[in-house]
């Protein structure tokens, strides 16, 4: 009777080397190469044939040699029939050969499936471990320099907190504000910032806005303005934090802050006199002076904001502002505010990589709050990106490792490992150069495709020949939409079917990455 586990892996000819390299350190794993070039083309019937062929060669049933079979590749079929026909359990492996070792090391933690690849379960295991680490850290008591903003612990022992600003909050209708807050919370915001409007006094709207926010969440709510009347109203109404205090309004606010639980973000500026320090030492000196006045007045919940500057900024540069943040943190044991949005909103680049790098810089210099609006379209998903980056950097620092193979990543548009099966060079068959043909035979009707971003759905509106709307098909995935259209006999021409599928795929990509979708126009120019 076998006591040591043995596994057989079945793969195709093209993946043979990758699979064998991936499992070469395991002496209890054998690899069988099926008589097929691409593993993805394997079907249950072909696998059964391969198993029976191998059994004839060995003179034994595979179930007497191996505990189970793993099949590699992007196989679409359920492999349940394989065990029914051969008697040996057969499961799907990981999508990528390079991930097989991770699967092998975690066999005791997952349930192998005949339908689903093992990748998602492996990711869940890694993520669960990460979340447990973070949860354990959240249970720590406050240390030196740490504070509580509302019920949220902020300080060096905890992950960097993400503060999402709702720009021009007083201009939003109640429903719009609610939707924005819900979206920010779903994106992972630890705190919600109600951004006021420059050169306006909307103090009378703060009470209602705070109520709307607090009816939706227990997360801390801050009010962002330099208007002294608005700041006083926010303090009196019990806002969890105010942004911002500087030399110009500090003296007026101290009497109200003394007896409140409101945390205060302090700047090195005096906007009343248009003073903005433009050197590293100037930033630090002014900030320390403003903070000293607050401390002397008995105010303890202080967050320092040396002001992170945009790239290529006139006056104090981005790099100088980073150095100012770092030097201030070295000299002062206070929570540090890091205005990431000052950079991303003024930088024409996809936000995810910029946010990842800025969060990493923030972690190295000791930042505790990552602040961002999602004011421009290019910065959509910034809150979600910063939340992921915060977790990555917290775990990397805790484990004393690089922000790589952590369990979280911000690789959205490329791949960490690039593995493609290329077969076209192996076929000795005619090659036909593709050419467009502008001739089209019109179908009986047509579709207008749109995106419902609120419900995260693709919408296909069907029009008859008279251009009258007839019905709407809604769905999350192109497949369910085009299969519904075919089932309803709305598409009869091949070129229309091809066009419809292409446009649905474009809409799905646009919905997923937050890009604008216009039917008949390329997503990427």
UniProtKB/Swiss-Prot annotation:
Recorded topology in the membrane: Multi-pass membrane protein
Alphabetized InterPro entries for the sequence: DHP_synth-like, Dihydropt_synth, Dihydropteroate_synth-like_sf, DUF6513, Pterin-binding_dom, PterinBD-DUF4346
Superkingdom field: Archaea
UniProt keyword Membrane, yes or no: yes
Start and end residues of each Pterin-binding domain: 146-394
GO MF terms, alphabetically ordered: dihydroneopterin aldolase activity; transferase activity
Parts of the chain that traverse the membrane: 28-48, 353-373
Annotated localization: Cell membrane
BP GO annotations: folic acid-containing compound biosynthetic process
Transmembrane helix keyword on record: yes
Main location: membrane
Keywords: Cell membrane, Membrane, Transmembrane, Transmembrane helix
Pfam families the record matches: DUF6513, Pterin_bind, PterinBD-DUF4346
GO cellular component: a single term: plasma membrane
CDD domains found in the cross-reference section: Pterin_binding
UniProt-listed PROSITE patterns: PTERIN_BINDING
Known function: Unknown. Does not possess dihydropteroate synthase (DHPS) activity since it does not catalyze the condensation of 6-hydroxymethyl-7,8-dihydropterin pyrophosphate (DHPP) and 4-aminobenzoate to form 7,8-dihydropteroate.
Protein's recorded name: Uncharacterized protein MJ0107
